[in-house]
Amino acid sequence: MQEGIRMRVISTSHRSHKTMLPWLVSFGLFMENLDSTVINTAIPQMAHTLAVNPLSLKLAVTSYLLSLVLFMPISGYLADKLGTKRIFISAITVFTFGSLLCGLSTSLTMLIIARIIQGIGGAMMVPTGRLILVKTFEKSAMVNALSNMAVIGQIGPAFGPLLGGALTSYLSWHWVFLINLPIGVLGIFFAYRWIDENHTAQTPSFDIKGFILFGLGLVTINLFLSLADNRLISLKLLEVSLAIGIISLVTYYFYAKNKTYPMISFSPFKTHTFKVAVLGSLWIRITVNSLPFILPLLLQINFGYSAFISGLLILPYGLGLISAKFIIKSLLRYLGYRRILLINPCIIALIVLYFAYLNPMSSIFLIAFLCFFAGLVCSIQFSSMQTLNYIDIQDQEKSQASSLASVFQQLAMNLGVCLTALSLEFFNVPLQPQKTLISLHAFHSSFVFLALVAASSTIVFQMLKKTAGLNALQTT
């Protein structure tokens, strides 16, 4: 009898820990996404403290993103080789240590090195966390688990401008990074308690040649995207960077096809739902990821709001992200994946298009409402795409699928910010030859461009079968 009671206690404890896993993993994504945006509002004070030109601090942003993209592909291999629990805890530790170094930085060089360390931790933290959920939950529960992760993770970019402005204004820019320390320590503690070890019994040797080819391609293409709007960079250097990137990735593609165990396998693309979800998400994420970047600029540069007030106006975006969690499962059951992924991008496009009609006299309540509605539909889109990624993926391919999806998501983030910056630069030329500020015309034209990009993603999602994801929804 005592043995039976003990087993029931253990079973109840296990279910409780399993229930908390999505929230634990979500905070890893939250920290990574937060660090991608929170630094932007702190750049002027950082430049003053470090005695450098504010434009030089762009390296602190791009070094973090490049580090993320470069080391993401090896996260799946390390998780299979050493175990998901060990890698997830190590990733949080590295990320937290990098955050400490960022907060203690006294020079631009030290800050860049610290940001690279941060990126290495973040690169392994999110794909491994997502893999933990995919391996822990059955299809029926995976929809809800990944939905929770998507919602919490996307709060980072939404709250980044507000948090960065508040910390910089009332404390100092160092706290933009030091705030990660208590979150990281708690994450390590609960990861030890809640995560069960999971690794693949037989793991092939590490693909060094593939890592070099794939990494070189990603780094050079990301350099091209990050520096394309910088007039100080020669056109020749940009052309060479793009050419090296394309050649490296094409070479890797043919190399991987002929290798039994490549570092990153494109075999998940043979699964129709994964292919459509990832390629479609690349388009829609360009628009969605650009909003936390372009909206603070519009509100501060053209509407004259302070960094803190503009952050408050964008705060409803984060509330919209959270609110979607309570309706996503019902929407998926009622409409199915295909209908949602065809209708939702059009709604996103209409909202973004409406931003093009805003002006300095627009009501702050209208701005807040649009931000809330944008967050709501964007969260529905993220949750739907993320769960669809893995619904039909076989167990042996889940590690590769997780890494591949993460790389595409990071590329989409870079594309969103870079294309938005290029659009603002392009449409600003006729009206602002001195480049002292960005014209309202440039913002409005950029919103129209982003709306068209969002709507075009329906071309990809239309390839989904009507029955896509139906089995998982019927068992939820």
Task: Label each region the model flagged.
Residues 75-209:
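Helix-loop-helix hairpins in multi-pass membrane proteins, especially solute transporters
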Residues 127, 148, 154-165, 218, ...:
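Glycine/proline-centered helix-kink
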